[in-house]
Amino acid sequence: MTDTSSSISRKSLRADSYQPQLIEEKWQNEWKISGLYKTREPKEDQKTFYALSMFPYPSGNLHMGHVRNYVITDVIARVHRMKGFSVLHPMGWDAFGLPAENAAIERNIQPDIWTEKNISHMRSQLDRLGLSIDWDREQTTSKSEYYKWTQSIFLKLYEAGLAYQKSATVNWDPVDKTVLANEQVDADGKSWRSGALVEKKQLKQWFLKITDYAEILLKDIDTLTEWPERVKTMQSNWIGKSVGVKINFQLLTKEKENLSVFTTRPDTLFGSTYLVLSPEDKLVDKLVDPKLINDLSNFRDYVSKLSDKERTAEGKPKNGMAIGAYAINPINQEKLPIWIADYVLSGYGTGAVMGVPAHDQRDLDFAQKYSLPIKYVIKPSGIIEKKKEVKAYSEVGVMINSGPFNGQKSDEVKSLITEKGIKENWAEKKTTYKLRDWLISRQRYWGCPIPIVHCAKCGIVPIEKENLPVFLPTNIQLSGKGNSPLKDNEWTKTQCPICKGIARRESDTMDTFICSSWYYLRFIDPNNKKNIIDKNLADRWMPVDQYVGGIEHAILHLLYARFITKVLRDKDMISIDEPFKKLLTQGMVQGITFKNPKTGKYIPPNKINNIKTPLDPSTGESLELIYEKMSKSKHNGIDPSTVIDKYGADTARMFILFKAPPEKDLEWDDADVEGQYRFLQRLWRLINESKTYNKLSLDSNENNNLNNLNQDEISLRRSVHLAIKEISNDLNEGNQFNTAISELMKLSNNMNELLGKCRISVVNESLSILIRILSPFAPHLAEEAWSTLKGKGSVHEQKWPEFDPNALKQDNYQLVIQMNGKVRGSIKIASETNKQEIEKIALNSDIAKKWLIDGSYKKVIVVLGKLVNIVY
């Protein structure tokens, strides 16, 4: 007989109202005072877990993209803390860069003051989200105690021959007045920040020799088993390895110099009918016919206005000019004209290309445009040779018009021609990469100073390590025009470290991506005054276990961080090969836009009378409703503070996590935000109704009294422990927060129905588990509930619950029956029924008989405990 002395009657109870703002402010203050989220020194044999979001630029305000990033990381950190890991979850600021300098110019304020003000505001915004951040480890890249070590890394690169200065054609942003790396120019040839059409300039610049690490960066992509395939593919393509042959064409000049061309298709050498150089190549000045110098100058002016991406874009017409010079094809001694063309870039391969129009579509288009010869040397196997072809043939086939190689397979001839060239000393095997050295010079003030001085006597001289940091001067007059603001400043005047004579400091500052290429290391050892990081601490915490950030950083930041990690490893400062073990690239947060399809104009929502049938207030034309990335220009941004003020941080967190899987784009929906708020209100009522009758704490010994349960208690325990199992699986397998919250909703519904029919022991166990598995998602409500029900300590210090397999056992369950994969009904079946018996029962069911003709079927698929699928 069931003991009902402690059963609960809930009908007469009134729940307190849910007031998230009061609860959240209370617990945020409490967590700060208690230092709850400080990183604890790992105990002996305790596992560590490093959870990190890509740190933000301090623009002054968080946007919903930030919120999604940081909440995702926070949930992961909280769950691992409850699972017994020593967790490191820090935050910092990627504070150098153009926006702060431009804002300072506009407002007539120094960038450091502007930046610190923004950091202070954004830190308070992050606190309002209830993030479990260890603020004692906060880092700001624009502070000298941080950039001292950025400069130290630069010196290590310089000592290793990996940092160098050279004159180069660079991408110039005419609006921001600075140089851009190739990666910072979009497909339309525009600056990634200002949107201005990028120009070309010849300037002396600092580079990092990332190309020395191209092969290992490519090879180690295979070790990144917990990175998205999309990111790995993007990096692999960017590195762009090509294995081929360097072929020397002898120039018809007095000196008889060679022009080197790299190709992956030596089998097409007989089909080469012209050679193409980059317009910027210095050899062009030497080879050009004097009569064509003006034409050359005009062509170079035209090319200087194009970005590299514009010049090489597929489908775009290619332009060129003959320069009046010739070279000899080494395979057949034919005389080939030399051209320059916009599609050949000086930094790729050898800067020269052999034109094989019959077997390369781009070369064919160019040859047809300028009436250059087209010579076919490969034909498809078994196909009769045609006299005239209009399409390039780029596949393997049979050699023709190729002297002694005629009739042989083209893929076999590749090696034969290569060996012939090596033997005759006009070819060599070579591997090239699309990846180019990292240009780090920036002609702006607000960046990390490059620790180099220029001496008329000693040349380029690095600053001594003991004299770091080279401080960025203060109170600089910023105009935003021309060269670096530091160039003509008194600050540049210094003494040469070698000869002690007059010297000049380097006036360029570093690309901000250098600052962010190593910050994850400094969080581990933030107060180390002797080294960047203690190697033992690095071994303990690295690599970052979970890194979270946007897909837009797939090439820039992530590739640079991998490069710097490998350099520091080679310098024996750290032991790891890769910085980030697991990478999650969250999708964008999108808002609804109202767009006039005819004009392309975006209309603010507050200008529209009827949202359901929106019209342009100016023209009366119908508007398109489209979800797009949130931005001011599209009038679809949502201020996180507004949402928190109205609904609370827990609601904002729950919506962000529930609306879409983390890697997918999220469409903002006010109705769904309301839905999450109502769910938390229901949970609040459930918990508050519980506290009025629950005189035992969550830690009561009566929790152990789980024998002789009635059917309602069995059902509740099964629901609770199934939720533990499913939510744990959702979090372990792909961070599926949306399905985890769905399980929470199911559990709360079942508890709402069954709590009043159960004894205190079952109620306490159920509430304890509910609050614990809720806590990573809605930390404030969970903490208040835990405190209200007199749980010991903080809920965030409790163990993550483990499910009881015995609680999941059932005498019977509903077996879903599918016919050809579609659900057609279900039948009750005994839990111990095996696969063979299930198959028989399913085939004899009324459901199966209804769909099977003459009882015939192809196969039966049984998933024990869940479903059977009959394929017919």
Curated annotation (Swiss-Prot):
This is Leucine--tRNA ligase. One of its GO terms (cellular component) is cytosol. It is an enzyme of class 6 (ligase). InterPro entries: aa-tRNA-synth_I_CS, aa-tRNA-synth_Ia, Leu-tRNA-ligase, Leu_tRNA-synth_edit, M/V/L/I-tRNA-synth_anticd-bd, Methionyl/Leucyl_tRNA_Synth, Rossmann-like_a/b/a_fold, tRNAsynth_Ia_anticodon-bd. A motif ('KMSKS' region) lies at residues 629-633. A motif ('HIGH' region) lies at residues 56-66. GO terms for molecular function: aminoacyl-tRNA deacylase activity; ATP binding; leucine-tRNA ligase activity. The gene is leuS. CDD domains: Anticodon_Ia_Leu_BEm (cd07958), LeuRS_core (cd00812). Its main location: cytoplasm. The keyword Cytoplasm applies. ATP binds at residue 632. It catalyses: tRNA(Leu) + L-leucine + ATP = L-leucyl-tRNA(Leu) + AMP + diphosphate. Its EC number is 6.1.1.4. GO terms for biological process: leucyl-tRNA aminoacylation. It is found in: Cytoplasm. Keywords: Aminoacyl-tRNA synthetase, ATP-binding, Cytoplasm, Ligase, Nucleotide-binding, Protein biosynthesis. Belongs to the class-I aminoacyl-tRNA synthetase family.
